[in-house]
A protein has these predicted regions:
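N-terminal amphipathic alpha-helix/helix-capping segment at the start of soluble metabolic enzymes
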Residues: 1-38
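Active-site beta->alpha loop and helix N-cap motifs at the rims of alpha/beta catalytic domains
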Residues: 44-51, 55, 66-133
Length: 133
């Protein structure tokens, strides 16, 4: 039986412990349901996290939603890293996943690891997401 996590107001404050991969694993083991929503900037991240959203995805859909491109294929790597850092600054205790854009991991393992590392260091992401065939 699944149940929803209970995020009380106290748990959503800036003083709360950061959401970690260990938390996500525990919630999964317990069958808990938790929200994961997309944010593209610090303000939206702050609102979502204070509303009880523990996991935030910085999606490559920002190419369409923020930059006005016709598809996600146009998401620049540096832009994605920059907005990932903005989301983490807005919600420092949320678990933030940066979405690696098209061609940022397709040309080889070395480049994929380097770009993922940039998301973790420059973008301060807790995890990276990529799409596999």
């Amino acid at each position: 039986m699944s149940h929803h996590i209970d995020t009380t107001e106290a748990e959503r404050t800036e003083d709360a412990s950061p959401v970690t991969l260990r938390d996500l694993r525990r919630w999964s083991r317990e069958g808990s349901v938790f929200p994961c929503l997309t944010a593209y900037d610090a303000t939206m991240a702050r609102w979502l996290h204070h509303s009880g959203v523990p996991v935030l995805l910085v999606g490559d859909s920002a190419a369409q939603v923020v930059l006005g491109y016709p598809s996600t294929l146009h998401a620049p790597l540096d832009f994605m890293i920059t907005i990932t850092a903005a989301v983490k600054r807005g919600a420092p205790n949320a678990f933030v996943m940066g979405d690696m854009p098209f061609m940022s991991y397709h040309l080889g393992d070395e480049e994929a690891v380097r770009n993922a590392g940039r998301f973790m260091t420059e973008g301060t992401a807790d995890a990276v997401k990529l799409e596999m065939d």
